């Protein structure tokens, strides 16, 4: 059974009353569990992957798309094969082709790319809806980068603008039970909490279901930490190393696993 456990009453809508459900009824409903594109790491919903420019987040995003489309594990995390749409809006097909050759000899037909799209409030939602209609097995959409689909807003209402934009994409993800991952940037100013470094107001990070921050201690290093936090996943820090030959971020350690082993 799906997540809809009561029907909207036209009388309630007419009287402008809240549609509610009591706890006993709610707990008796056999609701559909969340879909996970990557087990315990990336569920259906709206997510942000943030990192400094040229830190390697697009390589990570592309490899994620490839793993999901092939149904191959992302590090130690299982994936389920599905169709994937990657909006690589800062790249060309030539660059994506070159990177695919670096990553694999066999790119699947279930992995789709676009280098141009409409903006968020000017046709993008309709474009995605049409793609999902044509490719109903799609479970993951990556938008690289978030800023490419946004229009300049009023700085005086930056929080409201951030929250509204994320809300539109989250509603789209929830409606179709898919994961949408937004590739984004970090602030230049350091912070003890990596999540506070996500560019923009807390309207972005607060409205998303999960946030991932890819952060190097020094730019020239080939190691980084992926900080992961979200509503439906445990907090974890993944120590990664970028392999310059395979062009893949390889897992060195997972502090969540270490915590479980020591407990």
Predicted segments, located by residue:
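Gly/Ala-rich phosphate-binding loop of Rossmann-like dinucleotide-binding domains
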Residues: 69
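Short alpha-helical segments that sit at the start of domains
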Residues: 251-263
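Short, small/acidic-rich helices and loops at N termini and domain boundaries
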Residues: 1-18
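Phosphate-binding/switch region of NTP-binding enzymes
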Residues: 48-50, 54, 58-59, 87, ...
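Short gly/ser/thr-rich secondary-structure transition/capping motifs
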Residues: 27-33, 192-196
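Hydrophobic positions on the alpha1 helix immediately C-terminal to the Walker A/P-loop
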Residues: 60, 64
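Conserved inter-motif catalytic segment of the P-loop NTP-binding fold
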Residues: 14-18, 24, 31-33, 37-38, ...
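Pre-Walker A (Motif I) flank of P-loop NTPase domains
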Residues: 43-47, 82
């Amino acid at each position: 059974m799906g997540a809809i456990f009561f029907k909207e009453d036209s009388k309630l809508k007419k009287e402008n009353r809240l549609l509610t459900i009591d706890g006993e009824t709610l707990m008796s409903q056999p609701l559909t569990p969340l879909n996970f594109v990557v087990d315990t790491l990336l569920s259906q919903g709206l997510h942000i992957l943030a990192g400094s420019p040229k830190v390697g987040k697009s390589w990570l995003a592309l490899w994620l798309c490839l793993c999901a489309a092939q149904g191959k594990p992302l590090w130690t995390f299982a994936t389920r094969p599905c169709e994937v749409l990657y909006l690589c809006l800062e790249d060309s097909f030539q660059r994506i082709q070159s990177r695919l050759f670096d990553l694999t000899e066999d790119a699947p037909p279930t992995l789709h790319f676009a280098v141009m799209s409409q903006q968020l409030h000017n046709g993008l939602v309709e474009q995605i809806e049409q793609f999902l209609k044509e490719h109903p097995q799609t479970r993951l959409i990556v938008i690289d980068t978030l800023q490419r689909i946004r229009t300049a807003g009023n700085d005086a209402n930056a929080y409201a603008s951030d929250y509204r934009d994320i809300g539109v994409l989250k509603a789209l993800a929830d409606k179709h039970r898919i994961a949408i991952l937004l590739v984004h940037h970090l602030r230049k100013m350091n912070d003890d909490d990596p999540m506070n470094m996500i560019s923009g107001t807390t309207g972005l990070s607060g409205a998303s279901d999960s946030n991932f921050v890819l952060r190097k201690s020094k730019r020239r290093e080939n190691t980084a930490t992926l900080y992961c936090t979200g509503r439906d996943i445990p907090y974890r820090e993944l120590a990664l190393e970028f392999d310059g030959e395979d062009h893949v971020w390889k897992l060195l350690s997972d502090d969540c696993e270490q915590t479980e082993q020591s407990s």
